[in-house]
Every structure is written in structure tokens, then in C-alpha cells.
Amino acid sequence: MLKWIQGGISAVTGIAEPEYGQEYIHPCTERVKGKQPFHVTSTKDFEWRNPDYTNVETSTFYFTDLETGYTGFAQVIHSNIIGLHTTAQFTFRIYHKENTDDQIWTSVKLENFRIEGTNFYADNLSIVMNEEGTEVQFKSTVDENVEVDFTIRRAVDGVKVGEDPSTYYGDDVTQPWGSMRHVFWPRNHISGKIAAKNEETNVKIDLQFSEEKKHYSMFVFAMQGMKPHHAAKSWTFLNFQSEDYTAVLMEFTTPKSYANTTVNIGIVCDTKNILSVTVDNDAEYIDPEVDSVGWPVPKEISVSFNGINADIKDDDVESADPFNTIVKGKLDNLVERVDVMAEIPTFVKNIVSGVAGTKPYIYQFFDDFELTIKDQESKGFGWCEITFISESSEVEESAYDEN
């Protein structure tokens, strides 16, 4: 999902907004109601936009090795703060489902970075998409302890919701003051290698990817064109991969300034085709328990993907048979609870802490999941991220305290 905590976190400067109401948010999912949500992406959809206002763009490649139990992601974050300061960051995580100490995390600032259409370059790093828009190569040695060199190849079509996959904030869609956008390659073959080590913890991982084995990747390209705690108060993200199916959920709920509006995008595919792109999904948190920092963290999650088949035309949507798939799993393996406030500069922390109820945490899980479709069950692995950002939109006087 959009890792707004990493790299571009300074974009959170600002205080809470007035209570605008639902008419000030224009979800991409609403524009496809009564239509076929699934649109095939083009290469142009994955071009870096690099606007001159506050934004964070991320290019994230999740990988899942069904044979060894390894998962993780490699990511580049490109952020622009108020149109004045642009930064870029490489982040990487690898994690083993059974040997939970067998994990490595790194985050490194990038130098001399540049954008060329769909491609991104920096010292000792490159992300390059081929002209046909079927493959992406990711290479990085920016961290001397982490070597990444893999290529993903699309197994199914790329996905966007509607012709324009952006959700807009503001009273005028043609001149919005904020936006959120996601485009996906939900299921990809992956080949190459990852070599990572952490001498302090005595962890060394050498992972070889091959298209002939049960190795899969999910690629999401995202842009958040506004301050994160204004855009959303919570997120739910799921990347499920099995030998036969992929299911992806990207869901966020706005703060009450935008009427607690939920926008959810679901994708279900098999090994060769997109089965459905769904925009009426239900992510159920089962047995939530308030933890030591005050958030209701579920012990299990069940996601119902509800929509229509991907091959239904707009004119036939009303009479189309419903599509339904359920993906569920216990959240037993907490990879990390990321304390967002511990990661940001003091000045920004003072501002954000002045927004009452703002205590952002990201919970990352990796567990066994099961997908059910037409009475057929498929077991696989799921990477799930649950993010809590804020409970309120009220502002305290301390929001203005820069000390």
C-alpha cells in the first residue's frame, strides 16, 4: 500500500480540516457505479507524475515465495513537500513466515535521482519498464547489505478502476485540492535474486526467484496528493497469493471532514485472467482487541469481494450475475507495529500531535489465508496491513506549537 510513513512523512505538516461533507470527496469507485469497474492499464498509467504540490508517489513490488515461506517488498518513494523540497527513498523488507527472526528491514535515502516516464533512476538503483509494458526490472545496491535484482513479468492484465482511477478531494473535480490514485499489476511472475544480510542479528538471506517455481509478485503504483491525515483516517490492505489465485484489497476511510467515506478497490484473478474488479467490498475485523497503544487490532480478517465478472460490458451490468469471493485468515504473525510518530521530525510531530486523536500506527501481518470462490478453496499466503491514523478532526492549541 501507500507507505506514507516512509520517506515522505514530512508531508504531514498541517492541521485538521473543517467538516466539509461527502460532497467534497469524489471516489473513483462512485464514478463506475452501474458500469464495468475494470479497465486495462496502459504503460502511460505507470508514468511518474511528479506534480509541483505536496504529494507522495510510491512504486512498490511485493514478492511471495510459496515454496520457502518468504515474503516482502522493494519500494521507491518519491515525495514533494509543498512544491519546495523533493526527496526519494528506497525501502525494503524481507520476512519468513515460520522463522520470524529471519527478517531484514532497510530504508535508505536516494541520491541523484531522476524520473524518465515510467522509469526511475538514482545512484545504484533503477526501475525500468519495457516499452511493451509487460515487464519491470528492479535493481538496487544502495544498501551495501541488500542486493536486489529481479524482473517481474505480467501474468494478467494491469488494473485500474475506471478510465481515471483517481479519487478527488474538493468542491470542484476539475480543480481538486487533493487526490488519491492506485494502479496495479496484481499477479506477476518473478525471476532474479535477493541477497540480504544483517550482521548485528546474524541473519543472512539468499533468495532465488524463478518463473518455473511458485514465486509471485504484485506491483502497485500509487500517488497521494495531499496530507496523509487529511486524506484517510484508516487503511486496510491485503495481498493474497496462491498457486491458482490472487486477491488484492486496497481500502481507505476518510476522516469525518469528508464524512467518513470508505473507498475500496478489490481485484481477483486466476493464473491468466482478471476475474473481477470489485468496488463494493467488505473487510471484516474479527475479534478486535484494544492493544497497548489504544487501537482495536483484529485477530482475524475476512474480506468479501463483491462485484461482477470482468468480461461484463457496461450495457449488461444491471442484469449480470453477481461475483463473490471470500478471503480470510487469522492474523497471528505480526511482522511489525510501526509507530509513525516515532519516525517523524520533532517539528512535524508537534503539529500532528495537535490533531486530537491522531496516533498513527501500521500493523503488518503475514499469515496463511484461504480464498473461496464458487465452493472451491485455495490456500495461500496473505500480506495484510492495517493502518490506524486518527479518530478525530478537532484541533488543539498545541497544533501551533513549534517547540
Swiss-Prot record:
Alphabetically ordered keywords of this record: Cytoplasm, Endoplasmic reticulum, Golgi apparatus, Lipid transport, Membrane, Nucleus, Transport
Lineage, broadest ranks: Eukaryota, Fungi, Dikarya, Ascomycota, Saccharomycotina
Subcellular location field: Golgi apparatus, cis-Golgi network membrane; Endoplasmic reticulum membrane; Cytoplasm; Nucleus
Name recorded for this polypeptide: Ceramide-binding protein SVF1
One Pfam assignment: Svf1_C
InterPro entries: Ceramide-binding_SVF1 (IPR051385), Svf1-like_C (IPR033394), Svf1-like_N (IPR013931)
Peripherally associates with membranes: annotated segments: 1-18
Membrane topology: Peripheral membrane protein
Keyword Endoplasmic reticulum: yes
Record carries keyword Cytoplasm: yes
Cystine pairings recorded for this chain: none
Function of the molecule: Ceramide-binding protein that may transfer ceramides from the endoplasmic reticulum membrane to the cis-Golgi network membrane, and is thereby required for the biosynthesis of complex sphingolipids.
Gene of this entry: SVF1
GO terms (BP aspect): ER to Golgi ceramide transport; response to oxidative stress
Cited PANTHER family: CERAMIDE-BINDING PROTEIN SVF1-RELATED, SVF1-LIKE PROTEIN YDR222W-RELATED
Originating organism: Kluyveromyces lactis (strain ATCC 8585 / CBS 2359 / DSM 70799 / NBRC 1267 / NRRL Y-1140 / WM37)
